[in-house]
Amino acid sequence: GKRVVIKAGDSIPVKQRKGAAELVVTCIAAQQGVIKPADDAKDQKNPLAGSVPAKPEDLSDNANSVATLFSFGNFRFLDCGDLTWNVESKLVTPVNPIGIIDVYQVNHHGLASSNNPILLGSVQPTVSVMNNGHTKGCTPQTFATLNATKSIKAMYQVHKNLRKDSENNTTDELIANKTDRDSCKGHYVKMAVSPDGDSYTISIPAHGHS
C-alpha cells in the first residue's frame, strides 16, 4: 500500500455523509513542525506568548507527536496526542492559528510535561476529557491548569486518580472508572455531535450520565 508521512498543514481525506456538515481533519503539528497561521492573521499576536516559561528540551518521541484538529460544522475537537510543553507553546505562539475549540482531549494522559497553560488559554475549550490511568496522569500541575482555565465548564476523566493526591480528581459523576485496575470494567466516555455540528453531548453510558 501507499505510505504517507504526515506533516503539519496536511488535511486527511475522509468520506463525507450526505446531508451532514462537512468533516475536516487537519494535522496541525507533527515532528515538531506546526501549522502556519493564515496570511490575514499573521499580525494578530497572541497576548499569552511568553507568559509561561519553557521547559528543558524534550528529546523523546513525544515532542514529535501528531496533533489533529477535527472540525465538523461549527464543532471543533482538538487531539494533540502526547505533544509536550514547548511544542504546545510553539503551536499557538506568536500567533494562534487554531482559534477557539469546543472539546479538548487532555494531552499525554494529563502528565505535567504537557498541557501548557499557554495552549489551554489560547484554545479556550468548553470541555476537557482526560485519558488517564488509575495512577498515571492527572498530575497536580495539569489538574491545576485545567481548573484555572476559565472557559472549561466540565472536566471528564476516564479513570479516577487513586494515588495519595486524590484531591486531583474531577467530580465523581464525570469519571468513567472509579475502582482499581483489577476491578476496572473499562467504561468509556462518549462524545456525540449532531449532524449539523451545532450541538454535542458528552456522556458516560455505563453510569447513565449525559
Each language-model region and where it sits:
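Extracytoplasmic/periplasmic, Sec-exported soluble proteins
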Residues: 19, 60, 79, 96, ...
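Active-site-adjacent alpha-helix of alpha/beta-hydrolase-fold enzymes
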Residues: 127, 137, 142-154
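Active-site environment of divalent metal-dependent phosphoester hydrolases
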Residues: 12-13, 34-35, 84-90, 110-115, ...
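Flexible, acidic/histidine-containing loops and adjacent segments that form or flank the divalent-metal
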Residues: 1-86, 148-210
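Active-site catalytic pocket residues across diverse enzymes, especially alpha/beta-hydrolases
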Residues: 91, 95
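Active-site neighborhood of phospho(di)ester-bond hydrolases with catalytic His/Asp-centered motifs
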Residues: 77-83, 100-111, 126-133, 156-159
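N-proximal accessory regions
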Residues: 124-127, 207
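Short, conserved loop/helix-junction motifs that constitute active-site signature segments
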Residues: 96-100, 119-124, 146-150
